[in-house]
Amino acid sequence: MPLTALVRQLQQVPLTGEVLERSRRPDRLRLQGASRGARALLASAMARCEGAPLLVVVPTLEEAGRWAALLELMGWPTTQLYPTSEGSPYEAFDPTSEITWGQLQVLSELVDEQGDGWQGVIVATERALQPHLPPPAVLADQCLTLRKGASIDLEELAANLARLGYERVSTIEQEGSWSRRGDIVDLFPVSAELPVRLEFFGEDLEKLREFDPATQRSLDAVDLVRITPTGYGPLVADALRANLPDQLDQLLNAEAMEQLLAGDTPEGMRRLMGLAWQQPSSLLDYLPGHTLLVLDERRQAMAHGQQWFDHAEQHHGDEVDGLLPPTLHRPISDTIEALEAFAGFDLAELAETDQHPNSFDLNSRAVPAYPNQFGKLAGLIKDFQREKTRVWLLSAQPSRAVALLEEHDCITRFVPNPGDQPAIERLIEQNTPVALKTKGTAELEGLQLPAWRLALITDREFFGQQNLTASGYVRRRR
């Protein structure tokens, strides 16, 4: 996590505390005029100053992927991307399992920590703020946490897994399945990146180990495993069976109705969430009350949200014919109002001249790129040093970058461990640029924050490197 040291430095600058104080004014603070990397650094630093978890709301899922890749470099205990679907919530088919499982991976962490203990960061689109989830208490009741040393009845565990939608198979290959061989249970929770092998002695859970589904070889030991339902369908079906609404016969065909009454979960349960619960929840209902909420590019987010709301409103009127309550979509103005109930601020890449009563211009600038022209780069770094600007070098090959700069009488130092705080502090006090190693596919480019006296130079400026990232959502697996 190479940018941890930069975030720590920003936390220590008095200006960060002053900006944080401005965010507590009645008018919501807008930080403008900074690249995505600068916005991510400042959002992380301000949240860490508060000791608060962070939710970043962005306009699109593509942008969310870019933000998540950046925030992973900044030292958060966990960084999660919360995926959402662009489709209408009243479609007869549920969203793809990849999206549902990605959501459950985030929610299992929030539910298990019971809110206040969670200290991670989540990136989501404004669609996550629309009602699309069961109430937190309902999901929490249905989640299982198996801990090492616990006493567990294997027959009861099998019944619980079947109730949550897990399929019993002979060999584990994908999420949502489990198998048993004597006192060994293999399980692939939909909220996990790897399956888990549970080894019992009688009813005592002796060992929990992750394993590779391709080779079936055991990997690292773990202390606990969180098991969520395989989707929201089983929860909706349970709620509907407890209180059968009159219009259910018109919404489900005879076969689906028979499945539901027999205890199974037919396809397309998500659209019935408004019948199962009077008011479905959004991601906001799962967050701790002290979470810092950051809205990136408000105008774009509201435009996307309004377009989706119009589509959902039309689809509800055309397809459902008044049989379903309109509880799975709400106007974007209501969504933003719910977001603003949390502490936080807005971010914008471009400086706007709309006379906003509480805006702060970050005046961030790009660093000129001189690919493979280390004489020019050395001169640029020396100029920064004369201005008492703290210079950070972030590279996949930092030793090479340091050696090439040294040929032009520009002394920099590579710190192999980004957590070596004393060494980094000593170099900063000596006004020596600090080089750190990075890896991954985050889209990061050089930036300057003049007000914080900070400059970051990356492989884009050193070698002309450009990172290409996927535009869609791909759930992370190890």
What are these regions (language model features)?
Residues 1-478:
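ASCE RecA-like P-loop NTPase motor cores
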